[in-house]
Regions:
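A generic structural signal for well-ordered alpha-helical segments
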Residues: 32, 60, 110-111, 135
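Short, well-structured N-terminal submotif of metal-dependent ribonuclease cores
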Residues: 1-39, 46-60
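PIN-domain endoribonuclease scaffold, especially VapC-family toxins
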Residues: 41, 45-97
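Short Gly/charged-rich anion-binding patches and loops
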Residues: 23, 55, 106, 129-133, ...
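Acidic, PIN/NYN-like endoribonuclease modules and their adjacent C-terminal/linker elements
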Residues: 123-158
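A structural signal for short, well-ordered beta-strand segments and their strand-loop junctions
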Residues: 4, 38-40, 119-120, 143-146
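Active-site neighborhoods of divalent-metal-dependent phosphate/nucleic-acid chemistry enzymes
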Residues: 73-133
């Protein structure tokens, strides 16, 4: 199974202090090495602009290979997502005006094309243009879970 991580879930890793939760980081490393944990270049760009704690930031820099460049098929699927007018709101006004990275549609497309699962901390909200809403849409149909569910699927407990 491939898991495509959104910025929100990678950022949440800061709560798992490496000195206390060594097994989390060991498990994540195993998934990175097997190619099961990936993300997108756009997520990396968001992380670089964000406020990520030093450990998580260094961990991600040391594993930068997980941040894939969108394929032609993924970009075509992003275009399909945006054909649904409501989902054009995935690109917020700030991103449009300032040209800041927009990872959400690329994360979804990456998971769709690679038959993976999106991992995000965004929540399903009625009538919203959020990752879970897009994933749930009939024309998209991509599994979407949060970090806690991801860890449960790995069989991790602390």
């Amino acid at each position: 199974m491939i898991y495509v991580f959104d910025t929100s879930s990678l950022s949440k890793l800061k709560h798992f202090f490496p000195g206390v939760f060594k097994s989390v980081w060991t498990g994540l490393d195993g998934l990175v090495q097997s190619g099961e944990l990936i993300s997108t270049r756009e997520v990396w760009n968001e992380i670089e602009r964000g406020d990520v704690d030093p450990h998580t930031s260094q961990w991600l820099k040391d594993r930068k290979q997980i941040f894939t460049t969108p394929t032609a098929n993924e970009l075509r699927f992003v275009a399909q997502i945006f054909q649904i007018k409501h989902f054009q709101a995935l690109i917020g006004e700030k991103q449009r005006l300032m040209g800041t990275p927009v990872a959400d549609p690329v994360v979804i497309a990456c998971a769709k094309i690679r038959q993976g699962t999106v991992v995000t901390e965004e929540r399903l909200k009625p009538h919203a243009a959020k990752i879970p809403n897009v994933c749930q849409h009939a024309s998209v149909s991509v599994p979407c879970i949060d970090l806690e569910t991801f860890m449960q699927k790995q069989g991790w407990s602390f």
